[in-house]
Amino acid sequence: MGVVRVQHETKMENQSWLKKLARRLGPGHVVNLCFIVVLLFSTLLTWREVVVLEDAYISSQRNHLENVANALDKHLQYNVDKLIFLRNGMREALVAPLDFTSLRNAVTEFEQHRDEHAWQIELNRRRTLPVNGVSDALVSEGNFLSRENESLDNEITAALEVGYLLRLAHNSSSMVEQAMYVSRAGFYVSTQPTLFTRNVPTRYYGYVTQPWFIGHSQRENRHRAVRWFTSQPEHASNTEPQVTVSVPVDSNNYWYGVLGMSIPVRTMQQFLRNAIDKNLDGEYQLYDSKLRFLTSSNPDHPTGNIFDPRELALLAQAMEHDTRGGIRMDSRYVSWERLDHFDGVLARVHTLSEGVRGDFGSISIALTLLWALFTTMLLLSWYVIRRMVSNMYVLQSSLQWQAWHDTLTRLYNRGALFEKARPLAKLCQTHQHPFSVIQVDLDHFKAINDRFGHQAGDRVLSHAAGLISSSLRAQDVAGRVGGEEFCVILPGANLTQAAEVAERIRLKLNEKEMLIAKSTTIRISASLGVSSSEETGDYDFEQLQSLADRRLYLAKQAGRNRVFASDNA
């Protein structure tokens, strides 16, 4: 039933195991043995401190990494949020376009130029971005391209509207170098202007052949989520590596196009350098989802800590099971964390030499010296320390027992009983088990004290406590709560069962005479009150004790030496 078993009698050992061992082996052997044990435990403690220090070092590495990762994530999240905002605006514009004359004129202009090899529609260069497009013939040649869409006019006006938002969202302080909307219907809007109309087809097909566009087909991106892509420079090209975050634009289960933002790797490198604490060692490295190196916080040695294939395999294996962690690689410790708003990993590489020069290296050296000093002092002063510890242990055990028990009856005292009762009542309430309380008060105890003296009264209390303890179940708890008053806690017992236990206590107390003086015996009795949580559903121990106490006094008024389990009988 999950009820804690409580022992009602506590044995006091006369001698500790150290004294028994000393009697058998002699003080010298005991001292030597204790010295070995303490030395062993001091070594284990030092080892434990080393483990804690290592954990603190790992936590420090992770905290430094987390601070930089959070700062980078914050900026990336800002750009992702802008992208989602632009997509929502695009969807609204597709469903309910603005009824402006300039937008209607733009649709008319599109119909006039849609057959041209390249065309451009511009409303106001100072307020919005132009829409650049290619001919119907060129669109028909693309696998993913199509103008067979009833909402094509709405998409044209929506592109002009989102061009206004793109112009507002793009600024020089942003990490984003270019923001664009690329449509499957053969046109695009970009914050990077197309100076010559003849360059529109080349630029458009450069967009629609990129992975960040193709990867948003309904087959490749079924969840229509934000995705990140990395472009690496080719040997014959001066194109700077960059990452692109993009999201598909859909409406009524139709894929219109892709909204994207391109971030140069050099911008992310500059941000890493600004985000890290200049007083801290270690190098930060950014990798994409395929663990391809993107950039490092160390511009002087950009390839100094790049991992070999075996180390990359170890990292990939560790990243399969968690979003953050750390791993030791030879003399380096690598902590890593997946970014929330970028499909990649930020790693921090800390070498052994950097660790030794740091605070944790100094602490490790100091800890070793302290262990050596402690061992030397232990060798000189062990005998005195052993005696102090032994005496303090005996004193502590004695004080603890006295704090929880009544020394006369060897039962729990009032404070300890209340401490035991509350968790037992809560446990019974949790499992919907009954919880009962018995209050016991010895009859005419004051008369025994007055007639035979307090020494006889103490014998009566000790005798009664022993009989009460022997009448209880294993899980019951008994304590002395007053002069001649006892309380019994019965977890799991209903009112009927508690009344049976109370009757058993009453009979045991009353059926045996006890010798209190030479040729003088007396028979004692007690009045008992019983209460249970099943009566009112109340598991409050103090309330149940008060109810049992009231019934105890009803038993007193009814003639004593009886059990009252209700207010009527």
From Swiss-Prot:
Gene Ontology terms: cellular component: plasma membrane
Gene3D superfamilies: 3.30.70.270
Statement: the UniProt record of this protein carries the keyword Flavoprotein: no
Catalysed reactions, as listed in the record: 2 GTP = 3',3'-c-di-GMP + 2 diphosphate
All residue ranges annotated as the GGDEF domain in the record: 433-568
Site (Transition state stabilizer): K446
Pathway, per record: Glycan metabolism; bacterial cellulose biosynthesis; Purine metabolism; 3',5'-cyclic di-GMP biosynthesis
GO biological process, one term: negative regulation of bacterial-type flagellum-dependent cell motility
Active-site residues, record numbering mapped to chain: E484 (proton acceptor)
Record: residues binding substrate: N449, H454, D458
One protein family per Pfam: GGDEF
Chain ranges passing through the membrane: 25-45, 365-385
Cofactor remark: Binds 1 Mg(2+) ion per monomer.
Subunit organization: Homodimer.
The protein's name: Putative diguanylate cyclase DgcQ
Organism: Shigella flexneri
